[in-house]
Amino acid sequence: MKTRNRFFAAALGLLLLGAASSGWAQPKVWMTPAEIMAALKPGQWVQMEGTIQKDLTVMCTQLKIMTGDFLDDDWSLVGVVRKVDQEKQQMEIMRIPVKVHKDTEYENEAGTFKGFSQVKVGSFVEVEGTYLKDGTFLAKEVEDESQKLAEDSGLENTIEAEGKVEKVDVAKSTFTVMGMTIKITNQTKSRSVIR
């Protein structure tokens, strides 16, 4: 889906930039935690990956601070479905309620994922859409990626998100996206990306 496509396009761009500029001083790629926290601002678009902790905070493993033009429906979330309410047409990823509507599109690699009735607790999905002010994610597209979970059980405790930074706490080295508290550590790999 577009989140992963952007990720690979950005990585390819950085590789090409490095190849094209051989002989020139190479730009610094990874940012320190202090540089990350200084760069993060409320309203800044980011793409992050991390590991969910027992207290439901997220230890950030990778972060891209993004600049460019974004639309209200450019948000995305990838993770394990924790709850499903077929009647309300709603699922929960981490603690984020994800609602679908009649125009939501469904897909998977095999082409067999056709509707919300196939979403189950434990499914590994990517949703794209709009994160609303009330804390609900309105999905325009749901992709079932459960085959990846079968191949790598470590994904069960991971989360990926693309969206706007809501709050930054420099003292705690944390920020929030979609209500998730995300912790920056010395192991966090981060860079700025132009979209």
Predicted feature descriptions by range:
Residues K2-R195:
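Short, flexible, surface-exposed loop segments at domain boundaries
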